[in-house]
Design a protein with these regions (language model features):
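Short beta-strand-to-loop junctions in surface cap/lid or active-site-entrance loops
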Residues: 24-40
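The feature captures the conserved acid-bearing segment of alpha/beta-hydrolase catalytic domains
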Residues: 36, 139-203
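Short, surface-exposed "cap/lid" segments of acyl-processing enzymes
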Residues: 37-68
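Conserved alpha/beta-hydrolase
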Residues: 67-84
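Residue in the alpha/beta-hydrolase core beta-strand immediately N-terminal to the catalytic nucleophile
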Residues: 110, 133-135
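Gly/Ala-rich beta-loop-alpha elbow adjacent to hydrolase catalytic centers
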Residues: 112-121
Length: 298
């Protein structure tokens, strides 16, 4: 059963469906600071990862989610006990939460997730139209080469299947150097899939200065990408791939002027020509690589 706390509902508590026992949607900020559906820019639900050894529901919310709050969004997290945390059950629970927030009047619903949380965010985005954007950092659900040698590659193939099933949401994905759960090569393929489906998307592949599976949790990631992600989540962008300049690189969202956030170093976007839409950002070399050329080299 999915439980909504009173603070989340900004009303009476509400129990929904049977998606996952004791899975709970709670505020990721002080409950008194929630703006409510009529005043907030939208709602963000962050989903933690999954571990066989500890309860990831106790993990802190990453710093970049706080920038959404500062920009006028209401922020939540989906807490899931590991004993009941499966892709089908948690994906269904998250889809249910997104639908409920949309029905309660939030103009935008964004799902952000780390690792296993990224997978269930994409699952939810494939189940209905309530999800406006997905932010997935270090997506994984099938262990490492050491812990699951027979299934580790599903961190790639499973991801591709989920990307192909996204119905309408914008998708931002981050892959990090030194991630033991990453089979490698996922950035270009993910970009190609999203482009083929006509979805607005952002792929950041192994950015310099950010390494390991948990790179998105800290200050460095938030400083470089949080305000950019706020803009990506809020903007009405045409289909294609978009450049997210790190550290507040100046650019404009095509046809929209700029994106205003309270971040001290706001990053904005540049729309690429249609012929460049099938590309992935390579921050190590400082250029965008054509997907087909990258794949031919493999």
């Amino acid at each position: 059963m999915l439980l909504f706390t009173a603070a989340v509902a900004v009303a009476a508590p509400l129990s929904l469906g049977t998606a996952a026992a004791q899975t709970t949607l709670v505020p990721a900020q002080d409950a008194a600071s929630l703006l409510g559906s009529q005043q907030a820019q939208g709602a963000v639900i962050w989903s933690h990862g999954r571990s066989l050894l500890k309860e990831c529901s106790l993990a802190p919310t990453p710093e970049y989610i706080g920038v959404f709050r500062a920009a006028g969004w209401d922020t939540f997290r989906l807490n899931r006990p590991r004993i009941t945390d499966t892709l089908p059950a948690s994906g269904a629970a998250l889809a249910e939460a997104a639908e409920t927030l949309k029905q309660r009047g939030y103009r935008r619903v964004v799902l952000a997730g780390q690792s296993f949380g990224a997978f269930i965010s994409l699952i939810a985005a494939g189940r209905g139209d309530a999800v406006d954007a997905v932010i997935g950092t270090a997506p994984a659900a099938y262990g490492s080469a050491e812990s699951n040698p027979g299934g580790f590659l599903q961190n790639a193939s499973g991801l591709y299947d989920l990307l192909g099933a996204v119905r309408r949401a914008r998708v931002a994905l981050f892959f990090f150097d030194g991630d033991i759960f990453d089979p490698g090569g996922r950035g270009p393929v993910a970009d190609r899939i999203l482009a083929a489906h006509g979805l607005s998307h952002l792929v950041i592949d192994k950015p310099a200065g950010l390494s390991t599976h948990w790179a998105a949790a800290g200050t460095t990631f938030a400083t470089q990408y949080a305000s950019c992600l706020v803009g990506f989540a809020a903007a009405r962008l045409a289909a294609g791939a978009f450049d997210c300049g790190a550290q507040g690189a100046p650019a404009q969202i095509a046809g929209m002027g700029g994106v205003t956030t309270p971040s001290p170093a706001p990053a904005r976007f540049t729309s690429l020509p249609q012929g460049n839409s099938a590309s992935v950002i390579d921050l190590e070399s400082g250029r965008r690589e054509d997907v087909n050329r990258v794949l031919r080299r493999r």
